[in-house]
Amino acid sequence: METIGIVLNVGTDSVEAFERGFREHELPIWEDFQGRGVLLMATLTKLDISTKPAKGAVQYLVSVVFAGPEGHHLHDADPRFNAWNQIADQYQVGDGMAFGGATLLSVGV
């Protein structure tokens, strides 16, 4: 398993458009990858707690657990993701943060 965590800083004036776009563009990719056994679990979370808040932004945590490291590469090479990523970049204020690696322990997945 490989776990990826991304924190996005979405401008307060773009929250509705971002959430709508995420449902329209990214959610179908997750469903496709889960159906193919590539993705085990994924969540989009609006953060209430952050040690690094961004002024003028609502922060979101994207958490994805792939069956293996190839899932992350398949996702990032998917043309649907690349199209959504260009749209989503317009909603962000400031840099996001991305983390990932081999999952060491897991409960429930």
Residue ranges and their predicted role:
Residues S14-L44, N82-N85:
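Short amphipathic alpha-helical segments
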Residues M1-E2, E24:
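A generic alpha-helix surface/boundary motif
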Residues I29-Q34, F66-E70, Q86-Y91:
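Glycine-rich loops and low-complexity Gly/Arg-rich segments
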Residues V38-Q59, N82-V109:
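Glycine-rich beta-strand-turn "strand-cap" elements at beta-sheet edges
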Residues E2-G11, M41-F81:
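Short, well-ordered beta-strand segments in beta-rich or mixed alpha/beta enzyme
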